[in-house]
Amino acid sequence: MEKSSNNIVPRIGLGTYNMSSEEAEQMTYAAIDYGYRHIDTAAVYRNEDGVGRALNRIFTDTDLNRSDITITTKLWPGGLLKVDRVKNNEGTIKSLEKSLRNLDLEYVDLYLIHSPHARGKRLEQWETLLSQQEMGKIKNIGVSNWGINHLEELNDKGYPLPAANQIELHPWSQKPELVSYLQDNDIDIIAYSSLVPLSTWRHKDGENSLKTDQMYKDSEDANSPFKKLAVKYNVSEAQILLKWALQLGYAILPKSIQIDRMKDNFDLTFAIDEVDMELIENLDRGGSVTWEYGDPLAIK
């Protein structure tokens, strides 16, 4: 499996957002068995234990070793809502240790600060993770949903920049300025919510987001650009969206609880031609839609 530009994570990983612990166990095992070598989870997903059970089964049932699998999880920093206490040094360490227990691992390959909501504690959390990296509990430290201003806080203090930034990226939210900054600073780009333009993305009750009614209408349009491209290349709309990201050099984290779709998300051997990549580039609509409480990139 080809890895991302800085060799941090394999280019295609399994996302586990909104999976139950049991679903995460089932899909992690099935995905690794099929060829995935990167699993992405988070403390706030509450399914790290399921991922951990699957890993133990994989290491028992197959010849794969711990070093063959890349595991990403995330620190919930706090601060999203008033009742969401921001984590200090001690809270950050406790969260990491709990994730390691849940995963039944001695270290994680990539540990991300899940969002920039911790405002006054971002630097303290980063310092703490640097110390935990020195202790061998984390191989690579990164962030998620951080904008240029958040990253510049680290730069201004002379801290090493993150190994990766996991952000919402898809043809409707391409973030060219942030992407350029990340590339210029050798920060790996990991795209999540690649499938926002699909009509099936968060369409069930309780799956909240900032995706507008017009966006849903456009997703359902029988003549949408993605449907036309899917026909042209004889693939699914999801495969078009995922391949677009791969061809731009991003790592991706498609999530599915259906085995067939999980396999389709991995089988991306076709290529989108230059003309169609330019067509997709012109479909950008701007900001993020994944977080119902507002775009975390806008946090100061």
Predicted segments — roles?
Residues 1-69, 195-198, 297-299:
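N-terminal binding-site loop/beta-alpha segment at the start of enzyme catalytic domains
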Residues 3-4, 52-66, 100-104, 131-133, ...:
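Acidic (Asp/Glu)-rich catalytic clusters
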Residues 18-23, 42-50, 78-87, 117-121, ...:
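Acidic-and-aromatic substrate-binding clefts and catalytic sites of carbohydrate-active enzymes
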Residues 20-32, 85-103, 124, 149-151:
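Short, acidic/polar
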Residues 37, 106-109, 139, 163:
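Short acidic/polar active-site loop segments enriched in Thr and Asp
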Residues 65-80, 110-116, 145:
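A short, structured active-site edge motif that brings together acidic residues
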Residues 90-112, 131-135, 187:
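CE4/NodB-like, metal-dependent polysaccharide N-deacetylase domain
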Residues 116-300:
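Beta/alpha (TIM)-barrel catalytic core signal, keyed to glycine-rich beta->alpha loops juxtaposed to Asp/Glu
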